[in-house]
């Protein structure tokens, strides 16, 4: 009986010895052990869907990727591994044979760490150095084909350091840019403050100036006067500039229209009265005695008012009336019915005055001494001969007086103008005949006219003058009806000169 109990105890001890695995062995006599706690915790952390934003399985489900390293070290490592050192976690992965798949991101892989195959974790062993017979060699399983991986170790740390350096450089550049922008903004603020201060100062100065000006009594009057002066200058600058007036000229001015001179002509009564007063003061006896000196002048006689300017006025010449005046009368102008006159006087008895016709060729007037003289009996009382000057009629030409040299003056044109030089004068003022007349305007009567008969007695000269005037009227009528040419004008002038000579000789 005792022998049987001893045998049973020996058998039980043998079984116990056979079941207990040796220390450090994963499998003993076909019985598997549990995987390491590090691998179990890592698998649970990666497989948890709540942590996919921080860490999750890779595209091939044979690796896991840490997407947010700072948050992984701050939140997950303390929860599962009781520390927050990401580098320590990477080193522990390296001891279990994990490798870094992608150098640009934190992706790790192991042939026994697969999604949905948690039982393969027991095949992952921790790498330790062998110590002789105490360790049992684990059976080697066939390795699954895994792409080339990079060992996590010193190389991974250096790469992380380089990445941190690049991030630091980027942050430093951004900091420098922000500092420059801050300096620029500060400078702009300072400039704006200075401008604002200057504006405030100017505003204060303006207010103080206005306050002083309002208290000043003469400020408003001076301001108004300056405005009036400015307005006057503007109005004066807008007015047309007037030509300077000649000495003794009339107040009315003439306007030049298309080369013509518009002249002011006084009424017949005023002009006649002025001339009559001058003539009555002359020494008639002394004046008619000097008629024998052959000092003659030419008077250009226009048509009467009834035969005013017409369409043929530009192609015909006016008639010529010859008369005698005193030698020393000194008349600057001799008024006729047309308002056009010229003077020709010399000291010699033979007077030859050049005549300028339309063709510009000067002609000579025959000897004017052949004109019969007036008897002395018809002369009024003696007075100074030089009194016969007409200051009231000298300024008929409002625009200007033309100074003609003593040698003669020629004016080409359809109307003939006589050049009548004098010995004692360097220049003779000539009036142009381009005058705008009105048919209603009364013209000054001619020398031989019925207007003067009521003041002067008849003389033998009136007969000759009447004949000459009748010839002139016939000449004008023929000229108006037939339109004389320039050659006919010259012929008619020569015929009149001959008629005067025949009367004198007869």
Curated annotation (Swiss-Prot):
Region described as Hydrophobic repeat HR-A/B? 164-214
Q: Where is this protein localized, as stated in its record?
A: Nucleus
> By its UniProt entry, which SMART domains does this protein fall under?
HSF
Q: Where is this motif: AHA?
A: 449-456
Please indicate which superkingdom the organism of origin belongs to: Eukaryota
Read off the InterPro entries from this record.
HSF_DNA-bd, WH-like_DNA-bd_sf, WH_DNA-bd_sf
Quote the biased-composition stretches of kind Basic residues, using this chain's numbering. Answer: 232-243
Q: Which UniProt keywords apply?
A: Coiled coil, DNA-binding, Nucleus, Phosphoprotein, Stress response, Transcription, Transcription regulation
Q: How is it modified after translation?
A: Exhibits temperature-dependent phosphorylation.
Keyword Coiled coil in record: yes
Using the record for this protein, list the coiled-coil segments as residue ranges, or answer none: 157-207
Q: Where is this region: Disordered?
A: 231-254
Extract the GO molecular function terms from the UniProt entry: DNA-binding transcription factor activity; sequence-specific DNA binding
Q: Some GO term, biological process aspect, for this entry: which one? A: cellular response to heat
So what does this one do? Transcriptional regulator that specifically binds DNA of heat shock promoter elements (HSE).
- Name the PANTHER family on file: HEAT SHOCK FACTOR PROTEIN (PTHR10015:SF427), HEAT SHOCK TRANSCRIPTION FACTOR (PTHR10015)
Query: How does the record describe its quaternary structure?
Result: Homotrimer.
Sequence similarity: Belongs to the HSF family. Class A subfamily.
The entry's free-text remark on domains says: The hydrophobic-rich region (HR-A/B) corresponds to the oligomerization domain. AHA motifs are transcriptional activator elements.
Record-given protein name? Heat stress transcription factor A-1
The gene coding this protein = HSFA1
């Amino acid at each position: 009986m005792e022998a049987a109990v001893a045998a049973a105890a020996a058998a039980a001890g043998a079984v116990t010895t056979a079941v207990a695995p040796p220390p450090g062995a994963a499998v003993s006599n076909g019985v598997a052990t549990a995987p390491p706690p590090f691998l179990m915790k890592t698998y649970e952390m990666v497989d948890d869907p709540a942590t996919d934003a921080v860490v999750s399985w890779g595209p091939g489900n044979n690796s896991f990727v840490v997407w947010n390293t700072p948050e992984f070290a701050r939140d997950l490592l303390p929860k599962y591994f009781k520390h927050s050192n990401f580098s320590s976690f990477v080193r522990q992965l390296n001891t279990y044979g994990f490798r870094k798949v992608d150098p640009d991101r934190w992706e790790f892989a192991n042939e026994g760490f697969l999604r949905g195959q948690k039982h393969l974790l027991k095949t992952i062993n921790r790498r330790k150095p062998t110590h002789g017979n105490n360790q049992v060699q684990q059976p080697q399983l066939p390795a699954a084909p895994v792409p080339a991986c990079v060992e996590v170790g010193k190389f991974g740390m250096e790469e992380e350091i380089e990445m941190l350096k690049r991030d630091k450089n980027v942050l430093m550049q951004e900091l420098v840019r922000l500092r420059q922008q801050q300096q620029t903004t500060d400078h702009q603020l300072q400039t704006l403050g200075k401008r604002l201060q200057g504006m405030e100062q100017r505003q204060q100065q303006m207010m103080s100036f206005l306050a002083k000006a309002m208290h000043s009594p003469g400020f408003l009057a001076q301001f108004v006067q300056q405005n009036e002066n400015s307005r006057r200058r503007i109005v004066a600058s807008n007015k047309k500039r007037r030509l300077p007036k000649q000495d003794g000229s009339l107040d009315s001015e003439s306007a030049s229209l298309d080369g013509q001179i518009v002249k002011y002509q006084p009424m017949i009564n005023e002009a006649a009265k002025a001339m009559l007063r001058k003539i009555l003061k002359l020494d008639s006896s002394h004046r008619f005695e000097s008629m024998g000196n052959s000092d003659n002048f030419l008077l250009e006689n226009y048509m009467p008012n009834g035969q005013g300017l017409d369409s043929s006025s530009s192609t015909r010449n006016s008639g010529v009336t010859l008369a005698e005046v005193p030698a020393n009368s000194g008349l600057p102008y001799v008024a006729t019915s047309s308002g056009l006159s010229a003077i020709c006087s010399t000291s010699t008895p033979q007077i030859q005055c050049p005549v300028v016709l339309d063709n510009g060729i000067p002609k000579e007037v025959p000897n004017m001494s052949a004109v019969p003289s007036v008897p002395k009996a018809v002369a009024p009382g003696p007075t100074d001969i030089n009194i016969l000057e007409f200051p009231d009629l000298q300024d008929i030409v409002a625009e200007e007086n033309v100074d003609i040299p003593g040698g003669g003056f020629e004016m080409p044109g359809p109307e003939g103008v006589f050049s009548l030089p004098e010995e004692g004068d360097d220049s003779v003022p000539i009036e142009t005949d381009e005058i705008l007349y009105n048919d209603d305007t009364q013209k000054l009567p001619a020398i031989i006219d019925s207007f003067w008969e009521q003041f002067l007695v008849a003389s033998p000269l009136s007969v000759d003058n009447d004949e000459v005037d009748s010839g002139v009227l016939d000449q004008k009528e023929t000229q108006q009806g037939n339109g004389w040419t320039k050659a006919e004008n010259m012929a008619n002038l020569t015929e009149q000169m001959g008629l005067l000579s025949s009367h004198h000789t007869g």
